[in-house]
């Protein structure tokens, strides 16, 4: 009887162990192909590949993963990988936007909007992975000492779904970036064509000038010297004519200034004479009045002096 119970117990434990340690599902062919493309693609794809590898390691739910999930280390590393991926993606998007400048504004706005939406979906997928692991860590800490088999199975199922969604959105983002890059390449080619069209007439003008210079170089030296002398003579005559015209203008300006000064001097002289006349008209009556008063005063003084010097009659006569 004891032997039978021991056999049953061993069988039960073996079954539990086999059930708990479930083998990780092998990656599907699209996942392997996508990961291979990330390993040899743009910097943002390489960063996403590192996030993908780390998520695959977490999905194994090994003992080391279980221990690190009890601490914030896994979520911190996932956050770092997320930030690195989004940073590289924004840098690549900015680079493509610079190359897309020759494209029509409407097309550029539409492509940018679609790419931004795909970028947001990818960021949301990575954020969901991190949030799910944070939730699992909280639940795992609350169940210390208890069976976590059901919790692990639920996490494994969620991680599989999140990986599939992440793969789908990453593939969609790659396709939209390819369209964006094709538009940038087309815009660059249009820009080159426009530059070529603008430079064409300039090149033709340069060719004509070179031909003209070549024909001038083929002329005899005496003819070229004579033509140069005529041009210099015409230039000197033109400068002399301009100088004479300028001198005439200066003379006219000086004459105008002199006439204005003489006119102003005459006006000042007339104003001074008028002012002098007004002063004279003001003070002449006053002077005449003072003279009359002075003459009257002198007469009164003389009369008073004459009266005081007259002889007094004597009483003896």
Swiss-Prot record:
Region Specificity for association with VLDL: what ranges? 278-290
Q: Which domain of life is it from?
A: Eukaryota
* PTM characteristics: APOE exists as multiple glycosylated and sialylated glycoforms within cells and in plasma. The extent of glycosylation and sialylation are tissue and context specific. Glycated in plasma VLDL.
Q: Which gene encodes it?
A: APOE
The cross-references to InterPro entries, in alphabetical order and at most eight, read:
ApoA_E (IPR000074), Apolipoprotein_A1/A4/E (IPR050163)
Q: Where are the sequence repeats?
A: 80-101, 102-123, 124-145, 146-167, 168-189, 190-211, 212-233, 234-255
Organism listed in the record: Theropithecus gelada (Gelada baboon)
Modification type Phosphoserine: residues: 147
What is the name of the protein in this document? Apolipoprotein E
Query: At what positions is Methionine sulfoxide found?
Result: 143
Q: Which cysteines are joined by disulfide bonds?
A: none
Annotated Gene Ontology MF terms? Answer: cholesterol transfer activity; heparin binding; phosphatidylcholine-sterol O-acyltransferase activator activity; phospholipid binding
